Amino acid sequence: MSKSTATAQNLSFVLEGIHQVKFEDRPIPELKDPHDVLVNVKFTGICGSDVHYWEHGSIGQFVVKGPMVLGHESSGVISKVGSAVTGLKVGDRVAMEPGIPCRRCEPCKAGKYNLCEKMAFAATPPYDGTLAKFYVLPEDFCYKLPDNISLQEGALMEPLGVAVHIVKQASVTPGQSVIVFGAGPVGLLCCAVAKAFGAAKIIAVDIQKARLDFAKKYAATSTFEPAKVSAVDNADRLRKENNLGVGADVVIDASGAEPSVHTGIHVLRPGGTYVQGGMGRSEIMFPIMAACTKELAIKGSFRYGSGDYNLAVGLVASGKVNVKDLITGVVEFHDAEQAFKEVKAGKGIKTLIAGIQD
């Protein structure tokens, strides 16, 4: 794999097959619409989906059939603007929302553009991602960063947008008790957003003690490590140890693990709300009797939608959510493959890949 960046115009980190990646110099993308902008990508976070494509070549129905640039959690600096762009100028620092909907279908017109069937989402086959020197986006999918948000923090607006959408789906209100299963980046950010929304109790659940220790220092009011017992027994212990009475108001699953789903359903109070944010196996066993007899409100959550990125930026700018502490490593662009290996091995919380240096 070549590591030369000295003469590259648009060096890109390209997935060619399972565990097969290369650096490839590609043409600088053209602005195809007068509302487009060209972004010089400065930082990109490594997401679990990127690692999954690298390791397996597919996620569900999305199969990598040809070379694809990885990456979608990015920030950058505006390098060029289209003739109709009014809200941004060259030199502006932006967070990049990496999914472009059709804007015309029923979900788009209803304000749920994250459900658009024609969504062109970065690093989701067949669309290239943002691990390149340059990337083109419509101006309204770039969010200008205030002076008190760094470009490194700007790259975390993507996972924070995911967490914002999940917590909004849960309709978290002040004083509620919220249990978050999975203390990875999205789960931790769900804890932080729930705290910003006024939740009184925020309980992080994970099987890794190191993650729980971080969660307690970060945003959780308490933590819970499940025992190797039934979901009902773990739910009972969760309630008792955290004085939850008949159960929690809200459960968010950011793990996708079947045991977490089961425990989450059982630990909710009657009439509680369950939101599935993590994706695991496409089909699992589900405690439907408990869900029905407790009249639970059960929702899914997918990516982010209208207003989520703006709220994410606002939460960080106001100091209500801290994303800086999640950044545990920054590597140079030519070390991208090694960074993927370290993320796969579970090292750190959020690793960023720096953009190509001029």
Swiss-Prot record:
Cofactor field: Zn(2+)
Keyword annotations from UniProtKB, A to Z: Carbohydrate metabolism, Metal-binding, NAD, Oxidoreductase, Xylose metabolism, Zinc
Metabolic or biological pathway, per its Swiss-Prot or TrEMBL entry: Carbohydrate degradation; L-arabinose degradation via L-arabinitol; D-xylulose 5-phosphate from L-arabinose (fungal route): step 4/5
Cofactor binding note from Swiss-Prot or TrEMBL: Binds 1 zinc ion per subunit.
Organism taxonomic ancestry: Eukaryota, Fungi, Dikarya, Ascomycota, Pezizomycotina
Tree of life domain: Eukaryota
Catalytic activity: xylitol + NAD(+) = D-xylulose + NADH + H(+)
PROSITE patterns linked: ADH_ZINC
Name by which UniProt lists this protein: Probable D-xylulose reductase A
Binding site residues for Zn(2+): C47, H72, E73
Top EC group: oxidoreductase
Originating gene: xdhA
SUPFAM superfamilies according to UniProt: GroES-like, NAD(P)-binding Rossmann-fold domains
Enzyme nomenclature, EC number: 1.1.1.9
Function (record text): Xylitol dehydrogenase which catalyzes the conversion of xylitol to D-xylulose. Xylose is a major component of hemicelluloses such as xylan. Most fungi utilize D-xylose via three enzymatic reactions, xylose reductase (XR), xylitol dehydrogenase (XDH), and xylulokinase, to form xylulose 5-phosphate, which enters pentose phosphate pathway.
